[in-house]
Amino acid sequence: NQIDGKSAFYLYDTFGFPLELTVELAQEEGLTVDEEGFTQAMEQQKQKARDNQNFSAKLSSDSSLYEELDASITSEFVGYELLEMDEPTNPLDLERITALNDGSKWQKSLKEGEQGTLITAKTPFYATMGGQKGDFGTITTEKGRFEVQETVKLPGGRIGHIGRVTAGTLTEGETAALSVDTANRNNTCKNHTATHLLQEALREVLGDHVEQSGSYQDGERTRFDFSHGQAMTAEEIQKVEDIVNRKIEENLSVETKVMSLEEAKKTGAMALFGEKYGDT
């Protein structure tokens, strides 16, 4: 006779189904909803997110954790060519775990339930940078499975896969299969491209003074920060939406190219909001 709080929260968290609507529909069927249980599930999710965020921040900012690592331990991003490295037909397809950290010290292994960061010499996982949130997915060995909840750039140019062991044990030196959540990556890339479309549309409607002061993209949304002397009118917002949607409907091809900063500027690329760019 009652929809439990966890189920109600699952509808909200996974499908964006408001609690109020769940309650209303349940009442129509003579059911109730455990709203207290919903609130508890919500708080547990928030606490988990806070824990993961704090853990990620510690791993990515505490340079002392990496001073003892051998300088030969590096990471190469191969995610433009591969999203999975799990077929033993190519030298890039499988990688060895070169380092594991539990947030306080380097370990030889991590067991089920433990949080940590994994480093491999090559990875298809994109690390958070340039406003785009890093990939998540799985790293699997013969003896364990690791859920990658965040991917970050670490001191020394390394890429860290941060997450939790969900089954078995992962040990340094083991061969691992790396698999990016492709749906999330594709959605994130679409939202990143949409950010550029949005910027151009805003400049067309509001003027060339519009410059990006910040942005954020993940698999669910994009955010574009800019300065304008006044609030946009409903008509201006509609014009911007129409321009962006027309470009999306054109289904233009998107290419990824690596070039020098000078070459990029010649193609019309904009260096924005004091961003620190490297040579490529």
Say what each PLM segment does.
Residues N1-T280:
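A glycine- and charged-residue-rich anion-binding loop/surface
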